[in-house]
Each structure stands twice: as C-alpha cells, then as structure tokens.
Amino acid sequence: MSFFIKDANAAVNQALEGNSYSLIFMLVTFILIFYFMLFRPQQKKDKEHKNLMNSIAPGDEVMTTSGFLGRVKKVTENGYVLLQLNNTTEIFIKKDFIVSSLPKGTLESL
C-alpha cells in the first residue's frame, strides 16, 4: 500500500514544477500586456505633448487645459507663456497647461 503513496507524491512534485513554468509565463504575458496597453501609449502622448511645447511661438492660437482659447503673445525662457484671450485680457500660464494648437483664424471665427 505504501508504494501508491510514493507514486502520488512523485506526481504532485511534477505537477508543481509544471505549474511554476506556467505561472512565470502568465506573469511575463501580463507584464507585456500592461506595457503595450498602458505605458507605451502614455509615452507616445508625452512625446507629442513635448513636441507641441517646443513648437509654440508668438502668434499661435492655442487651447489650455481649463478651456481658454487665446493667441500666444510671448514665450519666456522659464517655461511661461503670455496668452492674449481678447483685446484687453492677457494672462501668464505655464507652457505645460497648453493642450493643443488651433488652426489660424479660429479665434476670429468664434
């Protein structure tokens, strides 16, 4: 009767060894999925936003994160932008708060 128990223990050890490989495979698979579904798209967005920040020049029409639309009047060295909202209102904002660049003439059409 004891020989059945030895065979059963040997089978359990082999099964655990096979499960550890499948566990490692699953873990690597999930890491790859997270990388390509979450991290990679965010890196692309950050790169596009950085390119937008570097391309801002006086005269560009932009939209901010708070929804303000305005024309860039001046870009400072320390990362701030003087944004002209209308003929009488100008505000200083950080470059990072600019979401997108608008086509020329957008402000006049509103």
Swiss-Prot record:
Broad class of the protein's primary localization: membrane
Protein keywords: Cell inner membrane, Cell membrane, Membrane, Protein transport, Translocation, Transmembrane, Transmembrane helix, Transport
UniProt GO cellular component terms: plasma membrane
Ranges in a coiled coil: none
Keyword Transmembrane: yes
Location in the cell: Cell inner membrane
GO biological process: protein transport
UniProt superkingdom: Bacteria
Topology of the protein relative to the lipid bilayer: Single-pass membrane protein
Ranges that cross the membrane: 20-40
InterPro entries reported for this sequence: Preprotein_translocase_YajC
Protein's UniProt keywords contain Membrane: yes
Stated family: Belongs to the YajC family.
Known partners and oligomeric status: Part of the SecDF-YidC-YajC translocase complex. The SecDF-YidC-YajC translocase forms a supercomplex with SecYEG, called the holo-translocon (HTL).
Function: The SecYEG-SecDF-YajC-YidC holo-translocon (HTL) protein secretase/insertase is a supercomplex required for protein secretion, insertion of proteins into membranes, and assembly of membrane protein complexes. While the SecYEG complex is essential for assembly of a number of proteins and complexes, the SecDF-YajC-YidC subcomplex facilitates these functions.
Protein name in the entry: Sec translocon accessory complex subunit YajC
Native organism: Buchnera aphidicola subsp. Schizaphis graminum (strain Sg)
